[in-house]
Amino acid sequence: VPHWQGEVGLCTDFFQLAMLSMERTKSIEIGSAVLSILANGGPIAVAERIGNFCALQEVRGDSRRLNVGFSAGRFQFMAAPYGIVPRNNVEDVAWSALRGKIFWEACEIMLRLIRGDTIHSDDIRETILNRNDFRTEEDWLTVQNAHGEDSEEIKIPRRYIFEEIKSIPQNWSRKQLNLVLGSHQPELQTHVNKFMPVQVFNLSITQPEVIEATHERMKESYMGDWERRMMPRTVMVFLNEEDGLSENEKIECANEEAKGALTSYWAALEGTLDPMKVEKAANNAIIGNAATVAEQICERFHPDDRLMLWFDFFKHDSSRICRDMRAFMDKVVPLVNGGGN
């Protein structure tokens, strides 16, 4: 990460945290946004953790869902310790495109194991590179040269090799699992729904027209009845409802807090995200006191959207984060839902 100082891309064991949280609460569901399935032991290990968690939930008599948002992980260093690195010169020069293809392979393995299939690595889709996978003709020519011939397609050996396997336990309720794919690729969003019902995330900076196109596509491809809330809208929240401040002072303080955090956010993205996405980015933050935050939500989001709120970016004051979340629920939500003045 070229322009970031501090912790990023942490691979925490989400399932242990989820179990502890559910043991201490009655109504709250827990989710990951997002879990890298190329890290964390890879797709087979993640599938086993999911099945084991949901089975234990049934034993405990807890019917709450586990919400697993999963992705390849933005940062290469997260997956590298798990062997997700180029294996030869062809893979090295093709890596920007190939890493995404490995994620396709991992998705199919994980989803089929979760579904209860018995699979062999030969059953999984092959990875094939062609010109369409690369931004420029020059990039594709570089890969062809490394391959040693100008083939229209280059077959890449599978990343995961295994004999017939299945995940144990087999008998658990899949209704207790909600899967959400963190990928902007339309083809992958459609592909994963061949195996299991999989909802979708988009980046917080995704343009509105892309959001609407995704909803239309998911109406056709989702394994089930698609609802708008099934694609959470990620948004950073810079809310100030601190005591002792006037309404204008709250807004000024919120803007100051947001300025520093968002500057760091954009710096962190540089070199880790497709520059075209950054260039076309949409506003990804709501900023101000309760009234202005509520107004921004009503102006920018569809009434049926579900918001996934990010309160803690660049904040290390846990008590302040808790106050902000409480203020959001007590003061912002009633205004958005029509219960306030």
Each model region followed by its residue ranges:
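Acidic (Asp/Glu)-rich catalytic clusters
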Residues: A18-S27, F53-R65, H191-K194, M218-W226, ...
